[in-house]
């Protein structure tokens, strides 16, 4: 299972790289769960990341505005990200979500067909009015994405497992795999929960809080030693 660590700046990215993270995921926590960082930060992180590692970046917790979102996704792609993650926050239906992601895929793949597009839903979608998390695999498949992901929209101490049980997560992973896509799971994942995700067959686990000092995604900073510990748990 690959470990995706989400730094917010160059200093944290260096810690994530030194700790052995497999994917360096640039985000901006003050702007939300999948808050978008700035193009120059993505570019700086790409420049210091070893060639054998891939860089990911978030487009944001996006509205249902396919034009705006596809243009933003293009910006993420040309800034150097290999993975382009879109948080389907303002899309309320399957059709709206597919509409957004189709346009993102078209924009991103026009730059480089090898770029990896991630459709990200929210396990706690019912709290924010977003699209049903359990149809994210179909949305990813039908829009031409490469990865189906779940995170949590609200970072208030509740984790992925507080909203979806192991049975539902296993179904999500297996459905995603049946479409030939990769699965990614995140959402205030605790280090003791990594073994569960590994057992379920998850391809990528996304972490920020558990890699930060004090376990705090906002006030803490990513620490090399914590990343090393998480990497071992994923192996």
From Swiss-Prot:
Quote the Pfam families the UniProt record gives.
Answer: 4HFCP_synth (PF04476)
Hey, which pathway is this one from? Answer: Cofactor biosynthesis; methanofuran biosynthesis
The yes or no answer to whether the keyword Nucleotidyltransferase is present is: no
Similarity comment text for this entry: Belongs to the MfnB family.
> What are the protein's GO molecular function terms?
carbon-carbon lyase activity
User: What's this protein's function?
Assistant: Catalyzes the formation of 4-(hydroxymethyl)-2-furancarboxaldehyde phosphate (4-HFC-P) from two molecules of glyceraldehyde-3-P (GA-3-P).
The reaction(s) this protein catalyses: 2 D-glyceraldehyde 3-phosphate = 4-(hydroxymethyl)-2-furancarboxaldehyde phosphate + phosphate + 2 H2O
Q: Which InterPro entries would you find in this protein's record?
A: 4HFCP_synth, 4HFCP_synth_arc
Task: List, from the UniProt record, the residues annotated as the active site of this protein.
Answer: 27 (schiff-base intermediate with substrate), 85 (proton acceptor)
**Keyword terms, alphabetized:** Lyase, Schiff base
Supply the EC number(s): 4.2.3.153
Originating organism:
Methanococcus aeolicus (strain ATCC BAA-1280 / DSM 17508 / OCM 812 / Nankai-3)
What is the protein named? (5-formylfuran-3-yl)methyl phosphate synthase
